[in-house]
């Protein structure tokens, strides 16, 4: 029904009758009717017990579930290449993101948590009904230390004081910002919040696509991470961090971070810490087939992550951590069509009910950390 519902005015009343309902939390489905008012579910009841004026859809006994949530999506970077990010004209890249947002919705994703990038304008266009797309929980610019996972500068670019006029293209468009020190991190976080960020995204460890770091690197001092946490908490929200290795995960948690992104190289002691502190772990079931990195070094880093994914998921289940799911598809427009396929990869560790709950109810709980 998503193609029909997506074309409706958000003020419309919609009654979907005679459907088999999965509510996101209960393993058994039930037959019933659903009333939607102003783009939100208003009532779920037994078949034939709701009367309403407006659009009526007969589900004819088909399966109906909450919209899918991708808790680690990059609305801008998923459909633009790295070369686009570094050199392309902004109108071109933003138009591509707008088209991709409609495709994302048609794949069944009604909400995404954007894990970094210039999407405030895209969110506004969707919210105002200018273009179709999912609800977006934006993070704004990725916040990175010099030489960190979000440092997209050329090799010959010199370090410069935070806030000076010599910004890179990626900083000017709002894709990433380099901030070193407590004061700079505080300003960067506050500026993202000023622009409408739902949460703050910080890079506290090395990454696969990085130009200047190793996968095992820890990034940012604890006091720098805590500065972002304090800025977020003052605004009623939280910090999510890109990180893979135990020491950097531990440092992030000690600084007050609420959502660990990736974490594939985690050890048992650190997983126990995540569980004890009730921190969220948002992982991606990466496989070797995902490897489209151009350099040998990047390919080796990706292989290391894939080889450790099974251990990380098994530890997460053992300690019953609060687990979210996202795709983190980046810099390959041809790969976005695999967003749904990545859900199926979870079958290596979870049954069908656990998977559906994770990509609906569990991810919704994760997103609720930023408030209403």
Predicted region positions:
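Metal-associated gating/positioning segment near the N- to mid-region
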Residues: 62-128, 146-153, 223, 255
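Divalent metal-dependent hydrolysis catalytic cores, especially in the metallo-beta-lactamase
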Residues: 96-122, 133-142, 197-210, 238, ...
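Active-site mouth loops of central-metabolism enzymes
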Residues: 82-95, 164-187, 238-240
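Histidine/acidic residue-rich metal-binding segments in metalloenzymes
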Residues: 183-281, 302-323
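Histidine-rich, glycine-flanked metal-binding segment
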Residues: 11-13, 21, 25-65
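Divalent metal-coordination and catalytic microenvironments
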Residues: 19, 39, 61, 69-72, ...
């Amino acid at each position: 029904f998503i193609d029909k519902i997506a074309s409706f005015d958000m003020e419309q009343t919609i009654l979907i009758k005679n459907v088999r309902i999965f509510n996101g939390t209960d393993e058994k489905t039930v037959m019933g009717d659903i009333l939607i008012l102003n783009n939100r579910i208003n009532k779920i009841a037994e078949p034939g017990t709701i009367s309403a004026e407006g659009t009526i859809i007969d589900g004819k006994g088909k399966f109906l579930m909450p919209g899918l949530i991708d808790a680690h999506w990059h609305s801008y970077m998923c459909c633009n290449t790295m070369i686009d990010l570094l050199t392309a004209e902004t109108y071109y890249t933003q138009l591509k993101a707008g088209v991709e947002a409609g495709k994302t919705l048609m794949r069944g994703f009604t909400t995404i948590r954007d894990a970094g990038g210039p999407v405030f304008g895209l969110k506004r266009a969707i919210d105002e009904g200018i273009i179709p797309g999912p609800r977006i929980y934006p993070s704004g610019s990725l916040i990175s230390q010099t030489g960190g996972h979000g440092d997209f500068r050329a090799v010959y670019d010199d370090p410069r004081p935070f806030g000076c006029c010599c910004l890179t293209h990626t900083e000017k468009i709002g894709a990433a910002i380099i901030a070193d020190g407590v004061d700079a991190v505080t300003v960067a976080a506050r500026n993202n919040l000023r622009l409408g960020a739902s949460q703050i995204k910080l890079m506290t460890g090395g990454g696969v696509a990085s130009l200047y770091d190793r996968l095992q690197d820890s990034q940012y001092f604890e006091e720098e991470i805590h500065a972002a946490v304090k800025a977020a908490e003052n605004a009623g929200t939280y910090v999510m961090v890109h990180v893979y290795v135990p020491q950097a995960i531990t440092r992030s948690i000690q600084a007050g971070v609420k959502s660990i992104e990736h974490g594939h190289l985690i050890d048992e002691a650190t997983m126990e810490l995540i569980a004890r502190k009730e921190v969220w772990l948002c992982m991606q079931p990466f496989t070797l087939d995902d490897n489209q990195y151009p350099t040998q070094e990047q390919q080796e880093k990706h292989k290391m992550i894939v080889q450790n994914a099974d251990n990380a998921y098994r530890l997460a289940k053992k300690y019953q951590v609060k687990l979210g799911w996202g795709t983190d598809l980046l810099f390959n427009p041809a790969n976005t069509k695999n967003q749904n396929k990545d859900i199926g990869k979870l079958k290596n560790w979870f049954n069908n009910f656990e998977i559906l709950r994770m990509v609906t109810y569990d991810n919704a709980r994760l997103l609720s950390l930023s408030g209403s």
